[in-house]
From Swiss-Prot:
Motif stretch (DEAH box): 1073-1076
Residues annotated to bind ATP: 970-977
Organism: Neurospora crassa (strain ATCC 24698 / 74-OR23-1A / CBS 708.71 / DSM 1257 / FGSC 987)
Biased amino acid composition, Basic residues: 1826-1845
Gene that encodes it: crf1-1
GO cellular component: Swr1 complex
Xref: SUPFAM superfamilies: P-loop containing nucleoside triphosphate hydrolases (SSF52540)
Designated name of the protein: Helicase swr-1
Domain Helicase C-terminal: from-to ranges: 1510-1660
Domain Helicase ATP-binding, residue spans: 957-1122
Biased composition (Gly residues): 1704-1718
């Protein structure tokens, strides 16, 4: 179908699809004849004419329907163009084909063109309708049935065709039976598409005034070839683009000159097929116009086309169509992201590149497109004249070949050939089937032939061999030679194979040595990087100190610097005014000491202000800096005389004393750069020359910054380095300056005359501000670690604010220590103006100093007690410091872990002070202290906070004030929830921040958090977000309104389900309870929460370290994610490189055997954690906390358990599995062993025993013989005996009948009636008798009817006989007489019931109940024997047979008697008048069932398990002592067994697991705490760690061991927490000599790791029964096994779970490629593997119980701390293996031989090793595969062994 579009539509297409997006009012004129049902499609066409592309399918369908109903003369796509326009366009195209036309015509931006919005009237029709379906003025628009304007079509005729009368159809072709009279497709009103062949066209679907005539359909001319080919394609809506323009249209009159505006803004359609556009399927959304072609962008082309089109438009206007149509203006709202231009100056006008177009195009090809030119690097070179000529030649040649006779002529070119019609597939005929069968049969015959030939060959060879065997012949020379050749070849292959194997071994050995060298080099690199970072931070600190000492600071400079620093960094107290006042006060004091500072200028080695020299220090190494500043004097000495001497050139004694104090504070472990990099971000406003020097140093600052990357991004690091350079204007600082020992320098100076000098504290000649700055820049974490409380300090703090150097670096998480203002620990940064005496008296101890004596420490501690005194404090020796950093020469005061136990100073406590270690090994709780806390308790908080909770609030408030995230890691039970609520209340009261806050908690404690909020802070509006989808949707009403609620409490599952909702909201504080849920950074939970929009984050967890350091890193990175790709925490690889060594040593050999380097690294880790982690233990903060005792109860296996355990281990497949390397199979075996230990029913249930039922008994085989004998020998002939009963000749046969009954039968006799019926039937049968005539069907039917009548007669005759026989049955005496005369002797000794009713009452009175009790009935006897039968009828017969055995034992009569008796006993009895009769109970049912089915005894549940036996004794003891217990287990099935156990013993209990509803958990918890009658509460270990308070119990019983000790620790804290008044006893049930002892050992090793890294001596009040554990574990930590099978199981467990037996010093298993041992799974993934090894139903139950905190445990798998094995003497061992043990000794004794060149002669092995090493030089070394990546790739390989073979 081809259509005619208006010039507007043509213009839209000719303009390369570029239209104004704000205008959509272009009008079109359409034909008045429309296809019925095309209204919807036409609306789409009209609405989307100029703005979009129409859908291909819609266009195609519309075109088809239009073609089928409108037979109008075919008009080509360019029919809208008149002849004049064609001539103009042709002339223009000729001009455009010149070579330089494409270059000379300027380009223009397509977006700048606009089209005239005035509609262009139709060319041919006097009427036209607008695009909005409104008629013109004076016309009434016609509406269709829907009330919409009719569809619009272009008219193709001047007049409407007449409605001719119907003409006969043309004759149909012979291959067609009928032809469609109307449209083949009808679109109904509801938009459905129907076929027009079977559905008539309704009149209502046609327009009212436009009728489709049949003549219009029939008079359609045949389209030409091109139009036909075009009609098959989807016709575009604006089909004005065509290659050929027909000349059928008469040329219009010459048009007048068009207006300039119209000629400038309208365009003519280019005759290019690529420029045509398709309409969008949606008319409302204008589609983006397609990118115009390169030629179409030339402005000259568009102008020419616009001019020609405008001429054509003006010429086509008629008077009737010249009226203007209403203009529609669509206002499009600009996007919100675009700032509107309100002034011309806001527009970014691009400067002109040339005054004229010629100059522009001369330069445009060199200027990039982005800058306004035409140069595109990726495009082809400039279009030159030669290229244009070449293209023109190609075009001319194509035109020439198109002519007749050319290659492209229609008669020669294959492109013009019609497409071949697809032939229909030919149906299979008989010949086809026959051919297929023949082919198949041929294949089978050929295959059979081949098999026969092969068999014949084999038989021939076998015959030949057999013939030679039977007829041996002497071998010929050729045969002998052939055999020798084969033997030689075999030997050669063997030698080559052995030789290749030897070289392969050599290659493996060389690679092993290379790997060892690489590992050593890698360790050196890591250590060097660590030391370099430490040295760099220390050098920066020393440079700043030396620079401050030698710099002359004027009052103005000092004031300006202080003001800039104070204004540039946030104040600690949040008061900018106080900060400014304190800065001014400090600057005045500094100006008073300028004379002293001038005396220190000789500290500098040069007096000039060479900034380049100072800046160049950043790029120098440590050795170069030492050489450069070797002549600098030290800042302090180690004794009192050196401090006061004049050689140091100090100003005065107070200054020297202050220097010692500052040195004491600044000295630190030089190997620790974690906090050295926490320097302040001081800003100085130096001159521009210093800024230029900073820019020169930027290149050197881009290198890696070591541990600085832990805390700062690249931009912050660069800024810090620039500031460090600008702070050194004239002084060249010293490289390594000897730091003064505090114990030698501070104390004597402080104790002069019993009091300290009343002088300000200075650092050498440092002033107070300089001291604060240097301390902030330094790396020491004493500021964040120690608290020196005093009322004077508190008073002073109210007047002073942070020093300029104590600011925070923007919003970085891990900022400097002084910026993390913990309670009362802002000593150096806020109290620098305090005199020395006040400082000492206030603080007692200066932070982290080497105490000279215990008395001094006690005296200082007594002067001002600290917040928390750690129970054990010990400092390392000088050797430890030397081992940490060999280059450091100064003694450090960084805390170390001692040989026996680490000090609590190393723990990440934020508020600690040094105390004295008590001689007792058992440490008690510290003495109460009264420190000063600055953060007030918010008035919104109801209740009273404990002292340590108030300090926690102060710490949290300090974190928020410094824009820092943190971890509140208090031990379970210390009230982390209350402290969090207090923090939110503090934000509301003091910062006026009410929210919104997001609190994410486990599902089980959601309601608990809501109750705590309502109890402690009822002023908050709480939204508990949970429920189904509809409930959550209802709760989200008013979600973005801050006044609806303040705190949203939800669970981890809800966050994952509705993460999009939570992401869109900006949260002020996001708090995660039980934060170990996000310990896996690969889990969906971690990644989802990481992307939330939050201002601050807080993590609450009682176990910050559960398994390894990867989990700790996940928490740290979650708190400090990088912003815009910069900053954030260090990556995981670097973090593991720092701290992998101590972790592996702890897991291998325990905490006591750590080397000095590992201890130093542990100290560094503590310093990393201190700034943002608060960890308090119950023993440290609670003065009246009850003690906690831990016991291990070893349970002997029961007999059944031992049999199952040993039997499983002794299996061949079990041994093979334990020795294999497939860890899934090993874990499966270990899980089965654990099930046996927990209860044997978990491993295999006690069966319900039944007897074996034989299908046939043994005597049944003789049944046929017995029947044969009876039939043969005992057979009776019927004719020889007379049946008297049949003859009715036995008088007493009917005595069971009553005479009355027989008389009544005789009275009601119907004998006569039956006789009459018989006779009548006989007559009918005789009359209808017919002989059999099978000749016809009719005769057969007549015979069948006759036979039926005779059959009826015989039936009636039999009835007459039976009736007469029964009528004659009469008794002699009758039933009543016999019953009356019968004595009930079977009822004796009971008196029979009288038959006279009058005597029944006397019979009841005479009945004796004693007689009834003496002689019980059968039912009473069965009830009395029920207990005996139940207890002792427990042995079922081995075999039972069928019922045929009874017939041989009892006979037929016996069986009949038993059956009759059974029927009588089971007859229903009516017990009550209105109750239906019921059968009596079977007395033999219980005995029959007991002897048929043997159910296991309930008592065996306890006696089959050693743990339950021990638990029974333990519960009895607890119940007698008034204790209550919590019983924890891992497996859900064990909970079921415990329920049965408690039910058997009658104990009251409650059960809680993951399947318990959220609403019920709090109810169960409250019920247990308030009901002392409940003895036990059985829980799952997973549900035990969900923040549930069960202080009503004082005993915790672990039924089985969890491989993760953190889970057990959480379970203990359910009852050992605040509110517990009694001592807590913990019992662990461990099966002795089993795998559980090894699990206990592994848990102890992980606990050691937690003690060293996090706790540092956590169990101070836990009196663990270590002797019992040592009895099992042995002296070396190995489990004492009872037999070889136990040893194999323990070794397999070590291989799988990781242990000393399988990991070397490095952690990789002993081989280089890991093939020698099991593919070790991650330690944290073992729990998941154990779940996979369990039964399916157990796994489902465990998932339901652990869904709150273990939902994504499969993702939580992380690799344990593993490192490559230490080579040791592996090389020598391998040499010994190659040479042999004895031969090696002989080689050592031999004399060394030399060759002719005087070189030592080596062995072949050495030669091979050297040769291979030389050959492998430069080749890539295969490094050990990363276990984590390997697990990720092989995660889908469930249980497959993926090791290298």
């Amino acid at each position: 179908m081809t259509t005619m579009m208006t010039d507007s539509g043509t213009a839209s297409d000719s303009g390369a699809g570029l239209v104004d997006s704000t205008r959509n009012d272009t009008t079109t004129t359409t034909t008045t004849t429309t296809t019925p049902g095309d209204n919807d499609a036409d609306d789409d066409n009209t609405n989307g004419t100029t703005t979009g592309h129409h859908d291909n399918n819609e266009t195609d369908n519309n075109s088809k329907s239009y073609s089928s109903t409108h037979h109008v003369p075919a008009i080509d796509n360019t029919s809208t163009t008149n002849a004049n326009d064609n001539e103009d366009a042709a002339g223009f195209l000729d001009r455009d084909q010149s070579p330089l036309s494409s270059i000379s015509s300027p380009l223009s931006e397509p977006d700048n063109f606009e089209f005239d919005t005035e509609p262009i009237p139709s060319i041919l029709s006097p009427k036209s309708t607008t695009s909005d379906n409104h008629a013109r003025d004076g016309e009434t628009p016609e509406l269709d049935e829907d009330g919409q304007p009719p569809a619009k079509r272009r008219r193709v005729r001047e007049t409407t065709p007449h409605n001719h009368s119907r003409k006969p159809k043309p004759e149909s072709p012979p291959w067609k039976k009928f032809e469609a009279e109307g449209p083949t497709t009808i679109i109904t009103e509801d938009g459905r598409r129907k076929s027009g062949r079977v559905n008539p066209v309704l009149l209502g679907m046609k327009p009212s005034d436009k009728k489709v005539t049949r003549k219009a359909i029939q008079t359609s001319p045949v389209s030409n070839k091109s139009s036909a080919s075009t009609s098959r394609k989807p016709a575009p809506a604006s089909s004005s683009n065509s290659k050929h323009a027909p000349a059928k249209m008469p040329p219009p009159p010459p048009p007048p000159k068009a207006p300039a505006r119209k000629s400038a803004t309208t365009h003519e359609t280019r005759p290019s097929a690529s420029r045509s556009r398709r309409r969008s399927p949606s008319p409302r959304r204008p589609a983006t116009p397609p990118k115009p072609a390169a030629v179409g962008t030339r402005r000259s082309t568009r102008q020419a086309l616009a001019h020609s089109r405008a001429s054509y438009d003006d010429g086509q206007l008629s008077p009737g169509a010249s009226r203007a149509t209403p203009r529609i203006k669509l206002k499009v709202r600009p996007p919100l992201t675009v700032i509107p231009l309100v002034h011309p100056n806001q527009a970014n006008v691009r400067p002109k590149l040339g005054p004229t177009f010629e100059e522009y195009f001369a330069r445009a090809h060199e200027i990039p497109v982005e800058e306004g030119g035409q140069h595109i690097p990726d495009e082809e070179p400039k279009y030159t004249d030669e290229m244009a000529l070449q293209d023109a030649k190609v075009i001319l040649r194509v035109e020439k070949e198109v002519e007749p006779g050319g290659l492209l002529a229609p008669d020669r070119c294959s492109a013009f050939e019609p497409e071949a019609e697809e032939e229909p597939p030919r149906q299979w005929a008989h010949l086809d089937h026959l051919t297929k069968a023949m082919t198949n049969f041929r294949k089978l015959m050929y295959r059979e032939q081949q098999l026969h030939m092969q068999a014949a060959k084999r038989i021939a060879i076998a015959c030949e061999a057999e013939w030679r065997r039977r007829n041996p012949q002497p071998k010929t020379a050729e045969e002998i030679e052939l055999e020798e050749m084969e033997a030689s070849k075999a030997k050669w292959r063997q030698v080559i194979r052995a030789f290749a194997g030897t070289w392969e071994n050599v290659r493996v050995e060389v690679n092993r040595r290379r790997l060892v060298e690489w590992e050593a080099e890698e360790q050196r690199r890591v250590k060097a990087a660590l030391n370099q970072a430490v040295n760099l931070s220390e050098q920066k600190l020393q440079q700043r100190q030396a620079q401050v000492d030698g710099d002359e600071i004027t009052d103005e400079d000092e004031d300006e610097d202080d003001e800039d620093l104070a204004s540039g960094m946030p104040s600690v107290m949040g008061d900018e005014k106080e900060s400014d006042e304190h800065s001014d006060q400090g600057s005045d004091e500094m100006s008073d000491e300028n004379d002293e500072d001038e005396d220190e200028d000789n500290m500098s080695s040069s007096e000039d202000d060479d900034k380049k020299s100072t800046a160049s220090d950043e790029g120098l190494t440590q050795e170069e800096l030492r050489a450069k500043y070797a002549n600098l004097p030290t800042l302090g000495t180690t004794d009192e005389t050196e401090e006061t001497t004049k050689d140091v050139e100090m100003a005065d004694a107070p200054a020297a004393m202050d220097g010692s104090v500052a040195n004491d504070d600044d000295t630190s472990d030089e190997s620790v750069d974690m906090d050295d990099d926490l320097g302040s971000s001081e800003e100085s406003d130096d001159d521009e020359e210093e800024e230029e020097d900073d820019e020169e140093e930027e290149e050197s600052d881009d290198e890696p910054a070591g541990l600085l990357g832990l805390f700062f991004g690249k931009s912050e690091l660069k800024k810090l380095k620039e500031e460090a350079v600008t702070e050194e204007p004239s002084v060249e600082p010293a490289g390594d300056v000897e730091m003064t020992d505090a114990s030698a320098a501070l104390r004597p100076e402080l104790q002069v005359n019993g009091h300290a000098h009343e002088a300000p504290i200075t650092n050498g000649t440092h002033t107070n501000e300089q001291l604060a700055s240097s301390q902030t820049e330094g790396a020491d974490d004493e500021v964040s670690l120690l608290v020196i409380p005093n009322d004077e300090i508190a008073a002073e703090n109210t007047q002073t604010a942070a020093e300029p150097g104590s600011g925070v670096v923007e919003k970085d998480f891990l900022t400097n220590d002084s910026s993390l203002k913990y309670p009362n620990e802002i000593v150096q940064s806020e109290n620098q103006t305090l005199p020395a005496k006040e400082s000492v008296e206030a603080g007692g101890d200066l932070p982290m100093v080497d105490a000279p004596s215990t008395d001094d420490l006690q005296r200082e501690t007594a002067a001002a007690p600290s917040l928390e005194a750690p129970p054990n404090t010990r400092h390392d020796s000088q050797e430890t410091v030397a081992a940490t950093d060999m280059q450091s020469q100064s003694q450090t005061q960084s805390p170390k872990t001692t040989d026996t136990k680490p000090t609590d100073v190393d723990t990440p406590h934020s508020e600690l002070a040094v105390s004295v270690q008590k001689p007792d090994s058992r440490q008690s709780s510290p003495q109460p202290t009264t420190p000063t806390v600055k953060t007030e308790i918010p008035f919104l908080l109801r209740g009273t906070l404990r002292e340590y909770q108030h300090h926690g609030l102060d710490w949290l408030a300090g974190l928020y004030a410094n824009n820092t995230n943190g971890i509140l890691a208090d031990e379970m039970g210390l009230g982390k929830t209350i402290q969090t609520i207090a923090l939110l209340a503090h934000l509301a009261c003091h910062h006026e921040v009410w929210g919104p806050h997001l609190v994410i908690v486990p599902t089980s404690v959601m309601l608990n958090w809501e109750m705590e909020f309502k109890k402690w802070c009822p002023g908050f509006k709480i939204l508990t977000y949970y429920g189904n989808q509809e409930e959550r949707k209802r709760k989200r009403q008013g979600w973005n309104n801050d006044d609806v609620w303040n705190v949203c409490i939800t669970s981890y599952q809800m966050v994952l389900q509705d993460q999009q909702v939570f992401r869109r909201r900006r949260w002020h504080y996001m708090i995660l309870d039980e934060a170990h849920n996000i310990k896996n950074f690969k889990s969906q939970r971690w990644q989802t929460l990481l992307g939330f929009n939050t201002q601050a984050r807080l993590l609450l967890t009682g176990t910050p370290l559960q398994n390894n350091l990867t989990e700790l890193w996940s928490l740290l990175y979650f708190l400090a994610p990088p912003e815009n790709g910069e900053g954030g925490f260090v990556d995981l690889t670097e973090f593991h490189n720092w701290f992998a060594r101590p972790e592996s040593q702890i897991l291998e050999s325990g905490r006591e055997q750590l080397d000095d380097e590992a201890r130093a690294i542990i100290a560094k880790l503590h310093k990393v954690l201190r700034p943002y982690l608060l960890r308090r233990l119950k023993a440290d903060v609670e003065k009246q906390m009850p003690a906690k005792y831990e016991h291990v109860e070893f349970c002997r296996l029961s007999k059944r358990q031992r049999e199952l355990y040993d039997g499983f281990l002794s299996r061949a497949d079990t041994r093979e599995t334990l020795q294999s390397g497939n860890y899934m199979s090993i874990i499966n075996c270990l899980m089965q062993l654990r099930k046996v230990c927990n209860h044997p029913d978990l491993f295999v249930d006690r069966p319900i025993m039944t007897s074996f039922r034989m299908s046939r008994s043994v005597p049944a085989d003789y049944e046929w013989k017995e029947k044969f004998i009876r039939n043969r020998l005992l057979a009776t002939k019927p004719m020889t005996t007379v049946n008297l009963s049949f003859l009715n000749m036995i008088p007493t046969e009917y005595e069971d009948l009553s005479k009355t009954h027989t008389d009544r039968i005789a009275q009601l006799s119907s004998h006569r009636i039956l006789l009459d019926l018989r006779e009548a039937q006989k007559v009918r049968a005789n009359n209808a008798y017919t002989a059999l005539d099978p000749s016809s069907v009719k005769s057969n039917l007549v015979y069948l009817e006759s036979a039926a009548r005779w059959g009826r007669f015989e039936e009636l005759q039999h009835c007459v006989y039976i009736n007469a026989l029964r009528r004659q049955q009469r008794p002699i005496y009758g039933k009543r007489l016999t019953e009356f005369l019968t004595l009930d002797t079977h009822l004796r000794p009971y008196k029979p019931r009288p038959r006279v009713p009058a005597k029944i009452m006397s019979w009841f009175e005479e009945d004796s109940f004693l007689l009834h009790n003496a002689i019980p009935t059968l039912q009473q006897r069965a009830e009395s024997m029920e207990m005996t039968i139940t207890k002792f009828a427990c042995v079922t017969p081995a075999v039972v047979t069928g019922p045929e055995m009874n017939r041989f034992l009892l006979g037929e009569r016996g069986i009949q008697l038993f059956e009759d008796l059974d029927l009588k006993l089971s007859a229903p009895v009516k017990y009550a008048p209105y109750m239906p009769p019921q059968p009596p109970p079977d007395p033999w049912h219980e005995a029959r069932m007991r002897l048929t089915i043997q159910f296991p005894d309930k008592r065996l549940l306890q006696y089959d398990c050693g743990k339950l036996q021990a638990l029974d004794k333990l519960l009895r003891k607890l119940q007698a002592g008034g204790h209550r217990a919590l019983i924890f287990t891992q497996m859900t099935k064990v909970l079921d067994i415990l329920e049965q156990f408690l039910n058997i013993h009658g104990h009251k209990y409650l059960r809680l697991d993951g399947a318990t509803k959220v609403e019920q958990r709090q109810i169960l918890t409250d019920r247990f705490n308030h009901d002392p009658r409940i003895l036990c509460f059985i829980l799952s270990t997973r549900s035990g760690g969900l923040g549930i308070n069960l202080t009503g119990a004082d005993t915790v019983i672990f039924y089985d061991q969890d491989w993760n000790p953190a889970m057990d620790k959480q379970c203990q804290d359910r009852c050992h927490r605040i509110g517990q008044t009694r001592d807590v006893h913990i019992y662990r049930l461990v099966s002795e000599h089993t795998i559980e002892a090894n699990i206990l050992r592994k848990a102890s090793q992980k606990q050691m790791l937690d003690d060293v890294v996090i706790q540092e001596g956590e169990f101070t009040t836990d009196y663990f029964n270590r002797l019992s554990v040592r009895d099992v574990l042995g002296s070396n930590g190995e489990v004492i096994a009872s037999n070889e099978d136990d040893v194999a199981a323990n070794l397999a467990m070590d291989r799988v779970l990781g242990g000393p037996s399988t990991t070397g010093a490095g952690g990789y298993d002993g081989t280089a490629d890991g093939g020698g041992g099991a593919s070790q799974p991650p330690v944290r993934n073992v729990g998941r593997v154990l779940e996979m090894a369990e039964d399916r139903e157990d796994v489902d139950a465990a998932k339901a119980a652990e869904k709150e905190i273990m939902q994504d445990e499969a993702d939580f798998g992380e690799a344990g701390s593993t490192r490559p094995g230490t080579p040791g003497d592996g090389l020598a061992d391998l040499d010994g293996q190659l040479l042999g043990g004895e031969e090696n000794k002989e080689v050592e004794d031999e004399v060394i031989e030399y060759n002719a060149w005087g070189e030592r002669m080596h062995t072949i092995d050495e030669y091979m090793l050297g040769f291979m090493a030389k050959a492998l030089e430069g080749t890539p070394l295969e490094l050990p595969r990363d276990r984590k990546k390997g697990r990720d790739r092989n995660r889908n390989r469930k249980g497959k062994d993926s090791r290298k073979r």
